[in-house]
A protein has these predicted regions:
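Conserved beta-hairpin
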Residues: 11-22
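Conserved beta-strand in the GNAT
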Residues: 20-28, 35
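Extreme N-terminal starter segment of soluble prokaryotic enzymes
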Residues: 2-4
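C-terminal structural segments of small proteins and small subunits
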Residues: 61-93
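Structural motif
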Residues: 7-9, 30
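Conserved acetyl-CoA pyrophosphate-binding loop and the N-cap/start of the following alpha-helix
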Residues: 45, 49-57
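Conserved acetyl-CoA binding element of GNAT-fold acetyltransferases
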Residues: 33-43
Length: 93
């Protein structure tokens, strides 16, 4: 699969491959913390690694574009982060 491109909206990051939306992550900001509460990929993409790539692309977006600390409330996000501990620096203490 080609690279995922992230477009930021108000409290949502939407992921695209080319012009095709392949998922999104919803979050809410409270001060310097972003609570990541939902990720979604189309049913046809489930089980293909797209969800993992979505989470990683969104975590990179937070790292590169904000100073927020994250609180992953969606259970899929910590599952991905356990496999990619380099993103643990983003976690709220």
């Amino acid at each position: 699969m080609a690279d995922i491109r992230i477009e930021a909206e108000t409290e949502r990051l939407t992921a695209f491959v080319g012009d095709v939306r392949v998922g999104w992550m919803d979050f809410e900001v409270d001060g310097s913390t972003a609570r990541l509460y939902h990720t979604e990929v189309p049913a046809a993409q489930r089980g293909t690694g797209t969800g993992t790539r979505l989470v990683l692309a969104c975590l990179e977006w937070f790292r590169d574009n904000t100073d927020y600390r994250i609180v992953p409330l969606c259970p899929f996000i910590p599952a991905v982060m356990r496999r990619f501990p380099e993103y643990n620096e983003l976690l709220s203490r």
